Amino acid sequence: MSISKTYGVKDEELPWRALAEAVIVQAVKDYRICSQRIRQIQNRLHRRTGITPAEAIEQKWRLGRYLDAQGAIRDFFFSPRFHVLSDLNGRKLLERLDQEVL
């Protein structure tokens, strides 16, 4: 299952398919970025070395924002809109993405 490929609209017989694939690819990229940032912030907060209370508050705020964004993307993968855009199984895609982070 390749999720890193998009086609040029000029070469595509069905331009809507290229757009649909680009939407899915961007959602996958955004999910990966959120996962990486969440892990980095959680590690930073867990170590707590050299972090002032103000920095800890700011990091927790950032963590919340990334968790919210990741949740929205997760919801998208289970949405009817996702199934209109793609034949992929959203649950399997998420399992695969979550395995990448481990």
Identify the meaning behind each predicted range.
Residues 2-39:
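N-terminal acidic leader/helix
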Residues 26-31, 35, 45, 49-52, ...:
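Short, flexible helical or helix-coil boundary motifs
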Residues 39-65:
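Intrinsically disordered, low-complexity domain-flanking/linker segments in eukaryotic proteins
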Residues 56-81:
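Acidic, low-complexity, intrinsically disordered interaction modules
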Residues 73-102:
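Short, compact, well-ordered microdomains
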